[in-house]
Structure formats: structure tokens, C-alpha cells
From Swiss-Prot:
Pathway(s) of this molecule: Pyrimidine metabolism; CTP biosynthesis via de novo pathway; UDP from UMP (UMPK route): step 1/1
HAMAP family with a match to the protein in the record: PyrH_B
Residues binding ATP: 10-13, 53, 57, 160, 166, 169
Family assignment from sequence similarity: Belongs to the UMP kinase family.
Assembly mode: Homohexamer.
Superkingdom of the organism of origin: Bacteria
Cell location: Cytoplasm
Protein name: Uridylate kinase
GO terms (BP aspect): 'de novo' CTP biosynthetic process; UDP biosynthetic process
């Protein structure tokens, strides 16, 4: 029996690269979609927010002399490319995917309309949210927090390269331990990197829990959805 009825899954663009240095690794995206399909078959409603770092990062663009807002818009377009790839892979895997963009590109993807997104979720379709919040200066983490709150998700699942939040960097400190659960205030007090401050504050204010887990661990998404000890739960 799943622990959640409706989830918001945040995938980083980098996660789609697999072992590649750039772009979308086919085997990686297929495996991720298989994990998502497994969860939807359990009756869980799934919405996804996808990043764009495998193609372009607005923050990086801003640091090399490009106007930050322009760089961020480029980053948003990168997320649309990822969302289309994800939606296409989902369709091929037998899922019904709907890509919705926060910026209008009507000939390519439909615009984000909240009641429509909710309807799709109720119908068992997977909704992929593209183009972040549609505004520059906001990360896709913030988009995940925002969309999670808007659709009434019970939890935001942040899929990363590490399998949770640690007391220190596990690569540098062999004594570092993984937290099973931690409060929002403890994360701030210990100065731990979970997600960017805006996204984090939004989740805290909305009492929307966050689960940090590794997307590269086979079956991790299913275990998280089943409420098993996987990753780190950040709660009020």
C-alpha cells in the first residue's frame, strides 16, 4: 500500500545525462521512466518537474557575462527539451504523459493551467511541468515547491545523486551519517544543502515535506513511495 496518493517528483537535468558529459542518455531516461511507471501502476498520481542543467544552466550563463534573465530563459527552454524527451519516453513505455509549460510555446507543448493539470492527474496521466516557474531568477527547485503546493501533492521527492542528507559531505568525511529524517529548522540551523533557500522556505511555509533520495539507486522511488527507509525526510 503506497504511503502517498499524489507526489511531485523533482528530477535534475544532470540526472538525465547518466555517465555522459552532456545531453540525454537514452538508457538512463528509459530506466527512470520504468521507475515512474512502476509507481503509477500502484495507483499513485505523479507529477514531474524537470531541470535543464544537462543542456544549459542559467546561473552558469549569468556568470560568463550574459544577462542573467536571458540566461534563465535559455535554461527554461532547456527544461522544455528535457520534458519533451521525458514525455516521449513515457508514451513509448505505455504511460500517458502530458507536458505543460510555464511559458507559452503552444505549438510544441500546452500551457500550464492548474485545473487542467489536476484533471490529468485524476485521470491517471503523468504531468510533466516544464519551463520552471516561467520567471527568471527562480530555480527549478522552486518550481517543484510551487507546483507541489499548487497541485496539493503530499510530498516533494527530490531525486539527486546522493541518497539523502548527510551530517557532512560523505565524499570528504568517512564519519558522515545519513539522516533518516530531519526538521526544516534543523536543516537551516546545521546549514545543510537540501535545495535552494526560496524553494525550501516555500515548502516549510506550506508544511510540504521533502524527501531527498538517489535516483540512481534501483527501486529507490518505489521504496520512497511505499514509505520505506530510503533517503532523508525533511519535515516541519
Amino acid at each position: 500500500m503506497p504511503a502517498y496518493k499524489r507526489i511531485l517528483l523533482k528530477l535534475s537535468g544532470e540526472a538525465l545525462m547518466g555517465d555522459d558529459a552532456f545531453g540525454i542518455n537514452r538508457a538512463t531516461i528509459v530506466r527512470m521512466v520504468e521507475e515512474i511507471a512502476e509507481v503509477t501502476r500502484m495507483g499513485v498520481q505523479v507529477a514531474v518537474v524537470i531541470g535543464g542543467g544537462n543542456i544549459f544552466r542559467g546561473v552558469a550563463g549569468g556568470s560568463v557575462g550574459m544577462d542573467r534573465a536571458t540566461a534563465d530563459y535559455m535554461g527554461m527552454l532547456a527544461t522544455v527539451m528535457n520534458a519533451l524527451a521525458l514525455g516521449d519516453t513515457m508514451d513509448k513505455a505505455g504511460l500517458v504523459a502530458r507536458v505543460m509549460s510555464a511559458i507559452g510555446i503552444e505549438r510544441v507543448v500546452e500551457p500550464y493551467v492548474r485545473p487542467k493539470a489536476l484533471q490529468y492527474l485524476e485521470e491517471g496521466k503523468v504531468v510533466v511541468f516544464a519551463a520552471g516557474t516561467g520567471n527568471p531568477f527562480f530555480t527549478t527547485d522552486t518550481a517543484a515547491a510551487l507546483r507541489g503546493a499548487e497541485i496539493g501533492a503530499e510530498i516533494v521527492l527530490k531525486a539527486t545523486k546522493v541518497d539523502g542528507v548527510y551530517s557532512a559531505d560523505p565524499k570528504k568525511d568517512p564519519e558522515a551519517t545519513r539522516y533518516t529524517s530531519i526538521t526544516f529548522d534543523e536543516v537551516i540551523g546545521k546549514n545543510l544543502e537540501v535545495m535552494d533557500a526560496t524553494a525550501f522556505a516555500l515548502c516549510r511555509d506550506q508544511k510540504l515535506p521533502i524527501k531527498i533520495f538517489s535516483i540512481f539507486k534501483l527501486g529507490a522511488l518505489r521504496r520512497v513511495v511505499m514509505g520505506e527507509d530510503e533517503g532523508t525526510l525533511v519535515h516541519v
